[in-house]
Curated annotation (Swiss-Prot):
Protein name per UniProt: Malectin
Function: Carbohydrate-binding protein with a strong ligand preference for Glc2-N-glycan. May play a role in the early steps of protein N-glycosylation.
Glycosylation sites: 267
UniProt source species: Mus musculus (Mouse)
Gene behind this protein: Mlec
Biological process, per Gene Ontology: protein N-linked glycosylation
Length: 291
């Protein structure tokens, strides 16, 4: 009888130990072995390459480490003209990413080695800090020969001294680069080019590439002016539609007199010619009889 009791006690102890391990398991596991670590790294770890064009190294509020511009002293010119201005839509800590820039009088760009296949996103950061009207600086952006941004006019998009991000998703699989509905052979490097156009020089303020999708990209702060403009455009479209509807109804009313219903008219109008004819026939017959 003692053995069964001992066996029963051992089983209870094992059950208690198992329950304790289940409760403390998440705390005992190290970081990176949990569910989040298994699903994927955080935003800073997802960024495979980042550059503060025309500026020094910087770590933004999301933890992304932007390295110093590798083109310094090699290609184009660096400018910190934007340091004089506050940049809308950007946090105060990260305005430096939009206040410095690199531009060139000819097409220029960056080379980024990519070792692993998968989904990636190229994020380009811009701010117009010099020109105060549109059609003063317009250029294209190419990625491995594909035009991913056409006729970029920063001022026309967001106005002066305002942050603007261009977000370009892409995928690299089986030696092929897919972007903007086009496919090309991928040889291990991404070539990001800022193409000289007819209006001034191409430029960029900062840029980075992350492994992930557009949903992983931090969004800029809302632009009150742009939101108001969009709301006004929507209201104008609604008003125009309402006016068009009212005008259409009005035109339908004024399109002409309604056609009378012949079946609804009074039959007495048909008796008038008969009475006239009868009135003429009686006197004529009387005259003929007297003859």
């Amino acid at each position: 009888m003692l053995r069964p009791r001992g066996a029963e006690g051992t089983a209870v102890a094992l059950l208690r130990l198992l329950l304790l391990l289940l409760l403390l398991g998440p705390k005992l596991r190290g970081p990176g072995l949990g569910v989040v670590g298994a699903a994927g790294a955080g935003l800073p770890e997802s960024v495979i390459w980042a550059v503060n064009a025309g500026g020094e190294a910087h770590v933004d509020v999301h933890g992304i480490h932007f390295r110093k511009d590798p083109l310094e002293g090699r290609v184009g010119r660096a400018s910190d003209y934007g340091m004089k201005l506050p940049i809308l839509r950007s946090t105060p800590e990260d305005q430096i990413l939009y206040q410095t820039e690199r531009y060139n009088e000819e097409t220029f760009g960056y080379e980024v080695p990519v070792k692993e296949e998968g989904d990636y996103v190229l994020v380009l950061k811009f701010a117009e800090v010099y020109f105060a009207q549109s059609q003063q600086k317009v250029f294209d952006v190419r990625l491995n020969g594909h035009v991913v941004v056409k006729d970029l006019d920063i001022f026309d998009r967001v106005g002066h001294s305002t942050a603007h991000d261009e977000i370009i998703p892409m995928s690299i699989r089986k030696g092929k680069l897919s972007v903007r509905g086009e496919v090309s052979t991928f040889t291990g490097k991404l070539y990001i080019e800022f193409v000289k156009g007819y209006y001034d020089n191409p430029k960029v303020c900062a840029l980075y590439i992350l492994a992930g999708t557009v949903d992983d990209v931090p969004k800029l702060q809302p632009h009150p002016g742009l939101e108001k403009k969009e709301e006004e455009e929507e209201e104008e479209e609604y008003d125009e539609g309402s006016n068009l509807k009212r005008q259409t109804n009005k035109n339908r009313v004024q399109s002409g007199p309604r056609t009378p219903n012949p079946y609804a008219s009074d039959n007495s109008s048909l008796m008038f010619p008969i009475l006239v004819a009868f009135g003429v026939f009686i006197p004529t017959l009387f005259c003929l009889c007297r003859l």
